[in-house]
Amino acid sequence: MFIVFSSFEDQADSTSPSFISKKYALEELMTANHRVSDLFNAAKAHDSVGVIQKFKEARIQYKKVEFYLESYESDFTKFINGPPFKAVEFVGGGVDAQKPHGFQVIEELIFDEASPNYDRIMDECFFINKEFIRFINIIEVNPTSDASIFLGLKYGLIRIEALSIPAFDCPITLQVAEEISSSLESINKVIGFYADAYESKPTYTTIKATQKQIKEAQHYLEPSAGHFLDFESLDKLFFIKKHLQPINANIVDIFESIRVETPVLVRLFRYITHINRDAKNIYDPNFLDNMATAEKSYYSINKDEKLSPDVIALGKKLFNDNRLSNKNLMSCKTCHDPKLAFADGLPKAITNQEGMFQQRNAPTIVYAAYQGRLFT
């Protein structure tokens, strides 16, 4: 359906692990593009058995490159394998509900109807192919770095833990084990490129230990290993604690070692993201970029400016000042008490009129600080 030619041209050192990782990602993305074309052809032929098989193959292949795409353009991936619901975007001061696209939409078209909706499946395949080609072109013309590669690895592990294990991104097929194993295979491959580059460095030992951990995690997911029979019997908490968390912790250690061993990369590692890359698992209290302690914050409106002690002190003063209200009776703290997780603990929020209440409660502003970035 689509033919893509690539020369893998880049100004970076063609022997560097970041360049080799980029080349590998392009190859896997092109393969994913072909798998989607195979699905398109099966739908065009009204092959009900082939559509199911080609769909599963296409998404498993996509999982090999998903982590890399996340590090480039996270908004891109939600239109490839995001939930089959309209995405709310804030555009020009208004709200725009965008139509969902991607693998999960196809999943519903195949399994949630009496018979596959072949025309719509073909439309979705066309959309995915078009987006893959767009992204191939973006990757080819943009240089990469160790910083972006390791950010992608971290994103990949987060996606496994938050989306793949609970089957959030494969809710009907429930092919959790196969898709996680595919993601881990790709992560292991990329880490291997760094093993080759750092063979004479202390980092090498940690890299090889991480590769061993990944292989053990993949083995756990193999049906022949006998650890589970189906999605329901998969011990998800055990898999997270025994396998994913140690892998994630080692990725952070490797990341730090490369930063130390290669001083020129220090500046590249400091660009702002919405997660704390030093957090070793998603349950770390500082997993999200902490605007109270960070020099700069992804979640701050002025994220390009340093959060100085004076700015923080001013914010606290304004937060507690009743004089900013209409009748000098209320402050932000009135409805968002720090002692109550910045909520009010009431069924319905109070107003500045005695005995009158709002139609709803006052939600914690901790969530409000993250909402615009996390849920759009």
Can you say where each PLM-predicted feature lies in the sequence?
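Electron-transfer interface patches adjacent to heme c in soluble/periplasmic c-type cytochromes
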Residues: 275-278, 282-304, 326-330, 341-376
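Mature extracytoplasmic or organellar-lumen-exposed domains after removal of signal/transit peptides
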Residues: 11-291
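Bacterial Sec-dependent N-terminal signal peptides
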Residues: 1-14
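The canonical Cys-X-X-Cys-His
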Residues: 58, 315-339, 365
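Short helix-capping and inter-helix turn/linker motifs at the boundaries of alpha-helical repeat units
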Residues: 29-30, 305-309, 356
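Electrostatic cytochrome c docking/interface patches
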Residues: 21-24, 41-42, 47-48, 296-324
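Amphipathic alpha-helical interaction segments
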Residues: 62-72, 325-326, 339-343, 372
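Active-site-proximal structural scaffolding
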Residues: 180, 240, 308, 325-328, ...
